[in-house]
């Protein structure tokens, strides 16, 4: 196997198929929105459980975004404009106008919707993708975000 030192690709690395490219094109803006939502909750939520969850989300979102963005650039593809879990910027602006429990409830509902979109994107990659590292990212997205949905639903049920 020959690998070029400066390249991330090896000669036996499969070429990305349309599912791989779609996964990257959708997950990059998806994670960018997620990070914006997370940053909002860091500043605005007073709920200890929600803040703990948000800090957990923050670290892996940034790591995955960096990894996925490198594929976006390498493959010279654009971010998707529409994708599962896309939250309307006007809705996010209205959420940011809220305070206290009203903010937390609206934020949780939006993030659950957002996570459900990531799970759908991840499952599609697991089914149709062929780049092993991206399939691994998809598995992590599905597993992690399904667990977070359950946690957010618990927090929401107690509001």
PLM feature segments, named:
Residues 6-9:
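C-terminal motif of bacterial Sec signal peptides marking the signal peptidase cleavage site
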């Amino acid at each position: 196997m020959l690998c070029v030192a400066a390249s991330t690709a090896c000669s036996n690395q499969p070429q990305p198929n349309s599912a791989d490219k779609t996964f990257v094109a959708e997950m990059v803006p998806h994670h960018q929105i997620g990070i914006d939502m997370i940053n909002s909750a860091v500043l605005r939520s007073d709920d200890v459980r929600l803040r703990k969850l948000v800090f957990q989300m923050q670290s892996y979102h940034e790591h995955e975004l960096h990894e996925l963005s490198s594929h976006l650039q390498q493959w010279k593809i654009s971010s998707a404009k529409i994708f599962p879990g896309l939250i309307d910027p006007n809705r996010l602006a209205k959420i940011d106008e809220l305070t206290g429990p009203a903010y937390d409830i609206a934020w949780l509902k939006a993030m659950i919707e957002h996570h459900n979109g990531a799970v759908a994107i991840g499952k599609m990659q697991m089914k149709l993708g062929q780049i092993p590292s991206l399939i691994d990212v998809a598995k992590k997205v599905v597993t992690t975000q399904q667990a977070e949905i359950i946690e957010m639903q618990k927090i929401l049920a107690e509001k």
